[in-house]
Amino acid sequence: MGKNVVVLGTQWGDEGKGKIVDLLTERAKYVVRYQGGHNAGHTLVINGEKTVLHLIPSGILRENVISIIANGVVLAPDALMKEMNALESRGIPVRERLLISEACPLILPYHVALDNAREKARGAKAIGTTGRGIGPAYEDKVARRGLRVGDLFDKEAFAVKLKEIIEYHNFQLVNYYKEPAVDYQKTLDEIMAVADILTDMVVDVSDLLYKATQKGELVMFEGAQGTLLDIDHGTYPYVTSSNTTAGGVATGSGLGPCYVDYVLGIIKAYSTRVGAGPFPTELFDETGGYLREKGQEFGATTGRSRRTGWLDIIAIRRAVQINSLSGFCMTKLDVLDGLKEVKICTGYRMPDGSVIETTPLAADDWEGIEPVYETMPGWNESTFGVKEHRKLPQAALNYIKRVEELTGVPVDIISTGPDRSETIILRDPFDA
């Protein structure tokens, strides 16, 4: 049997998953997106050329890799076509390398309209969504009224279903949010224009992955966002609308959980977050600005600047537990270069003075929490582009070792730059 590897974020997303997936797909036959939508932003740099993917799996740039958008992903046809066209204009044969589950829910214009109307209505209490219709599309899925890719095989029936659901959502848009209605005919025409392109890529993903595993082919599952944004286990309600954790692999792809052999958690050497929500180690001083500028912490999807802070081991430990992590890949270590000292959060001081070492579950319970830090010496030497473990500064090695000690999880991969070549692999997940 083949070895199946999951790559996911351990923080609030933006950990650098895309590069690592691209790197490891050199050995994989399939790369599978199993949750989220085009709210993800995965940046790849190959031989100096930058590619940003939102919906298509990061394996698409590899000749011998099949990329799969599985049933757990909410699919926006317009976003997919835009991404496909951009890649095809560069000579990448996307339609030969991409497969789609017919069970993928569709994101349509009324989902986007609802998403933005709700954020506008929340005002100061806005969650900070990407405004791309992700949440409303998942709502329709759970309410069993959503349209899926498979519905496009019967265009007449699709048109009837679309009319019913647009009337349903327009009632809310117009009467409650006082926003314009979504035009039915325009929406229908747009989706019909690409219907055949989508259905031509449809495959039974669950069956395909099961047979691939039985044949010994290697499968990689590419997570989007991060553990702390999981709908169930994240800082609710400041979360995304899907299961970003390892448990989402089985439900989001149709391959049983026993077929997962290794879970790689991507851990940025410091913390970042986009949008509202708890962030105990957030920095508002010069150091926070330094991390943001040096780390180029601006969203690949929205362009929004990210909040920055020190590494939070308490939150990382939660990710270890939930995902049963096999190993870490530490990214952006080079951003810490030049700092006199680096800090790691090892506890939370509660308003009553007590110190806890677990994360609260509800967002309100995070109020008043102060981080308890362990301070370590920084390093002046550059780690950027270093490709050998022994050539890293001793202080940087000590930092990595301390993370391993505090979490009980080995750092198997270290990323020292954006290019796929700027990586130190201590243990390959496919060989672990």
From Swiss-Prot:
<feature type="binding site" description="in other chain">
    <location>
        <begin position="39"/>
        <end position="42"/>
    </location>
    <ligand>
        <name>IMP</name>
    </ligand>
</feature>
<feature type="binding site" description="in other chain">
    <location>
        <begin position="14"/>
        <end position="17"/>
    </location>
    <ligand>
        <name>IMP</name>
    </ligand>
</feature>
<feature type="binding site">
    <location>
        <position position="41"/>
    </location>
    <ligand>
        <name>Mg(2+)</name>
    </ligand>
</feature>
<dbReference type="GO" id="GO:0000287">
    <property type="term" value="F:magnesium ion binding"/>
</dbReference>
<keyword id="KW-0963">Cytoplasm</keyword>
<comment type="pathway">
    <text>Purine metabolism; AMP biosynthesis via de novo pathway; AMP from IMP: step 1/2.</text>
</comment>
<feature type="binding site" description="in other chain">
    <location>
        <position position="225"/>
    </location>
    <ligand>
        <name>IMP</name>
    </ligand>
</feature>
<dbReference type="GO" id="GO:0005525">
    <property type="term" value="F:GTP binding"/>
</dbReference>
<dbReference type="Pfam" id="PF00709">
    <property type="entry name" value="Adenylsucc_synt"/>
</dbReference>
<comment type="subunit">
    <text>Homodimer.</text>
</comment>
<dbReference type="InterPro" id="IPR042109">
    <property type="entry name" value="Adenylosuccinate_synth_dom1"/>
</dbReference>
<comment type="function">
    <text>Plays an important role in the de novo pathway of purine nucleotide biosynthesis. Catalyzes the first committed step in the biosynthesis of AMP from IMP.</text>
</comment>
<dbReference type="InterPro" id="IPR027417">
    <property type="entry name" value="P-loop_NTPase"/>
</dbReference>
<feature type="binding site">
    <location>
        <begin position="415"/>
        <end position="417"/>
    </location>
    <ligand>
        <name>GTP</name>
    </ligand>
</feature>
<feature type="binding site" description="in other chain">
    <location>
        <position position="130"/>
    </location>
    <ligand>
        <name>IMP</name>
    </ligand>
</feature>
<feature type="binding site">
    <location>
        <begin position="41"/>
        <end position="43"/>
    </location>
    <ligand>
        <name>GTP</name>
    </ligand>
</feature>
<dbReference type="GO" id="GO:0044208">
    <property type="term" value="P:'de novo' AMP biosynthetic process"/>
</dbReference>
<dbReference type="InterPro" id="IPR042110">
    <property type="entry name" value="Adenylosuccinate_synth_dom2"/>
</dbReference>
<feature type="binding site">
    <location>
        <position position="14"/>
    </location>
    <ligand>
        <name>Mg(2+)</name>
    </ligand>
</feature>
<comment type="similarity">
    <text>Belongs to the adenylosuccinate synthetase family.</text>
</comment>
<dbReference type="GO" id="GO:0004019">
    <property type="term" value="F:adenylosuccinate synthase activity"/>
</dbReference>
<dbReference type="InterPro" id="IPR033128">
    <property type="entry name" value="Adenylosuccin_syn_Lys_AS"/>
</dbReference>
<dbReference type="InterPro" id="IPR001114">
    <property type="entry name" value="Adenylosuccinate_synthetase"/>
</dbReference>
<feature type="active site" description="Proton acceptor">
    <location>
        <position position="14"/>
    </location>
</feature>
<protein>
    <recommendedName>
        <fullName>Adenylosuccinate synthetase 2</fullName>
        <ecNumber>6.3.4.4</ecNumber>
    </recommendedName>
</protein>
<feature type="binding site" description="in other chain">
    <location>
        <position position="240"/>
    </location>
    <ligand>
        <name>IMP</name>
    </ligand>
</feature>
<keyword id="KW-0658">Purine biosynthesis</keyword>
<feature type="binding site" description="in other chain">
    <location>
        <position position="304"/>
    </location>
    <ligand>
        <name>IMP</name>
    </ligand>
</feature>
<dbReference type="InterPro" id="IPR042111">
    <property type="entry name" value="Adenylosuccinate_synth_dom3"/>
</dbReference>
<keyword id="KW-0547">Nucleotide-binding</keyword>
<keyword id="KW-0342">GTP-binding</keyword>
<dbReference type="GO" id="GO:0046040">
    <property type="term" value="P:IMP metabolic process"/>
</dbReference>
<keyword id="KW-0460">Magnesium</keyword>
<dbReference type="InterPro" id="IPR018220">
    <property type="entry name" value="Adenylosuccin_syn_GTP-bd"/>
</dbReference>
<feature type="binding site">
    <location>
        <position position="306"/>
    </location>
    <ligand>
        <name>GTP</name>
    </ligand>
</feature>
<dbReference type="GO" id="GO:0005737">
    <property type="term" value="C:cytoplasm"/>
</dbReference>
<feature type="binding site">
    <location>
        <begin position="300"/>
        <end position="306"/>
    </location>
    <ligand>
        <name>substrate</name>
    </ligand>
</feature>
<keyword id="KW-0436">Ligase</keyword>
<feature type="active site" description="Proton donor">
    <location>
        <position position="42"/>
    </location>
</feature>
<feature type="binding site">
    <location>
        <position position="144"/>
    </location>
    <ligand>
        <name>IMP</name>
    </ligand>
</feature>
<feature type="binding site">
    <location>
        <begin position="13"/>
        <end position="19"/>
    </location>
    <ligand>
        <name>GTP</name>
    </ligand>
</feature>
<keyword id="KW-0479">Metal-binding</keyword>
